Amino acid sequence: LSGIEKPQAGSLISFNYQATGGPLENHDTLSCTVYLYEDYLWRMDDVTLIRVEKNQWKGTYQLSDNCALFALSFLAGEMWNRIIDNNDENGGYVFTTLDTQGKMLPGGYLGWGTFRKPSCFHIGNYFQKFDIQDEAVEMWTTKEMEHYAANLPKFVDIYMNMVALRMGEKNKKAVDFLFQKINKEFAVTEFIYATFENIYRFKLQDKEKADSIKAIVLKQYPNGFTARAQMFHQIEAMPLGEERLTQTEGFFKKYPYEDCVNDRFSKQ
């Protein structure tokens, strides 16, 4: 892969992919998927490839202004027999972007650390073999905090995963301390509450604490994503029939599909 040197957020990137000597050599049809980290959320998109020579392909893609990191994956074959080249063993075709001042964007350090730690963060099944050390994840997360600590409410779930790597998932004292600290230093959001509720409920097995946090969430955010999920699961558990149909119609009146799709927390 060539052509991408120091990509800038908001720019049109252009690259050349040489398949000679790799797993996709001599394939007549290739596709490309781009993984994008934008404002602390991941999404995927397709990139159109143009064949230049037998084993040489060219692609372009317009990055968004808030794209902090992206990764390319090249594919051939059908879903059930897919061959992939993403330079897995050597760290992937992964790039951080710079802003107009030459600085990394919010999420750049964090994305660089967590994306390359699939054993912990499982982002998009991009890597199958490559995996950085725990200490490296901590270093990049620390750098994100040094530069963009004010954004912690957006990536508190990832930050707490890093804490679990360092302190152990069962370290309740660390979780208690950080929950109190974040409550004091930030305007607490539903996402922060939900993150800690999940930690207490599933990792620490502290149902009482988890239930108390959930009660706060449902009271403060009666139409939030937690209430939406609870209502959905209640309807899902109902037997088939008129009552379930009525409740389902009521659900989509209260939570229109378009609003659910556009809710950033539905993508977490």
Q: For each predicted feature, which ranges?
A:
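Glycan-association/targeting regions that enable binding to alpha-glucans and other polysaccharides
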Residues: 1-236, 241-268
